[in-house]
Amino acid sequence: MLNLENIGPSEIYLPSYLFDKTHRYLDLLKKKYNKYEDISLYLVRDNVEMDDEKIDIVVIIRFYRNWVQTLVPIVPVDEISSEKKVEFYELILSLNNELADTSFELDKDLGLIMISNETHIDSYVFDVFEEEYNAILNALSEFFKRAKKIIPNITEIARKGMQKWLNKHSSYIGGFDSESLYKLDQTP
């Protein structure tokens, strides 16, 4: 007999339920994606606009004990010249302060600047998912507009950042090369 009194709230976690919910949410938003249920991960093909240009991105959705994280790897730190680093870091710190629901962060292992947000499973409903997902896209759009003034080839550098993250995790996700980076399988 299961004694629920001994189970704390942090131990009640249903990964398949969250994974299935995310599948439905992505279908409702008509997104193209690959799903990796064995490692609780979605890769979503999307794009953001900068001026008249559409920039292809890969949005990563992953699950931790009580959290759903949405993130996009964007800039390898080693791609930013030493002359531009201070101005670039000032930009992302300013954006961290200005933009709600998103945070720029550093993956030290990969030397990658990423943007992310987290949603607690207690509030993981479609409206919140859509709002958090769109917050990432809006923040990226604003980031690219401002970063282009500092680093003119920011979109090329961002593509390298996404590829770097995917390469690190390719053994789990089946590998991606530059040509197939944005050709994800699943369409609703």
Model-derived segments and their meaning:
Residues 41, 45-82:
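Hydrophobic-cavity lipid-handling domains and compact docking modules
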Residues 74-80, 119-128:
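A generic structural motif
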Residues 1-56:
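Charge-rich, low-complexity N-terminal segments
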Residues 113-117:
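Short, aliphatic-rich beta-strand segments
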Residues 71-112:
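Short, internal acidic amphipathic alpha-helical interface segments
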Residues 148-188:
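Short, highly charged C-terminal tails/helix-capping segments
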Residues 123-160:
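A contiguous, mid-protein "functional segment" used to position or interact
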Residues 32, 58-60, 103-105:
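Short, surface-exposed charged micro-motifs
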